[in-house]
């Protein structure tokens, strides 16, 4: 949802609000969330 996300694969909806939620979860625990 913003430039801090590792790449576009993690913003699957294209929706900024949901993208920000995914980004926060990724920052907290990237491997458990996206393994």
From Swiss-Prot:
Lineage top rank: taxon: Eukaryota
Single GO BP term: lipid catabolic process
Signal peptide: none
E.C. no: 4.6.1.-
Molecular function per GO: lyase activity; metal ion binding; toxin activity
Tissues expressed in: Expressed by the venom gland.
Cofactor(s) needed: Mg(2+)
Catalytic reaction annotation: an N-(acyl)-sphingosylphosphocholine = an N-(acyl)-sphingosyl-1,3-cyclic phosphate + choline; an N-(acyl)-sphingosylphosphoethanolamine = an N-(acyl)-sphingosyl-1,3-cyclic phosphate + ethanolamine; a 1-acyl-sn-glycero-3-phosphocholine = a 1-acyl-sn-glycero-2,3-cyclic phosphate + choline; a 1-acyl-sn-glycero-3-phosphoethanolamine = a 1-acyl-sn-glycero-2,3-cyclic phosphate + ethanolamine
Disulfide pairings: none
Protein residues bound to Mg(2+): 20
Recorded GO CC terms: extracellular region
Biological function: Dermonecrotic toxins cleave the phosphodiester linkage between the phosphate and headgroup of certain phospholipids (sphingolipid and lysolipid substrates), forming an alcohol (often choline) and a cyclic phosphate. This toxin acts on sphingomyelin (SM). It may also act on ceramide phosphoethanolamine (CPE), lysophosphatidylcholine (LPC) and lysophosphatidylethanolamine (LPE), but not on lysophosphatidylserine (LPS), and lysophosphatidylglycerol (LPG). It acts by transphosphatidylation, releasing exclusively cyclic phosphate products as second products.
The family this protein is said to belong to: Belongs to the arthropod phospholipase D family. Class II subfamily.
Protein name: Dermonecrotic toxin LgSicTox-beta-LOXN4
Species this chain originates from: Loxosceles gaucho
Species lineage: Eukaryota, Metazoa, Ecdysozoa, Arthropoda, Chelicerata
């Amino acid at each position: 949802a913003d430039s801090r996300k590792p790449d576009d694969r993690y913003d699957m909806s294209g929706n900024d609000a949901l993208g920000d939620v995914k980004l926060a979860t990724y920052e907290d625990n990237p491997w458990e969330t996206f393994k």
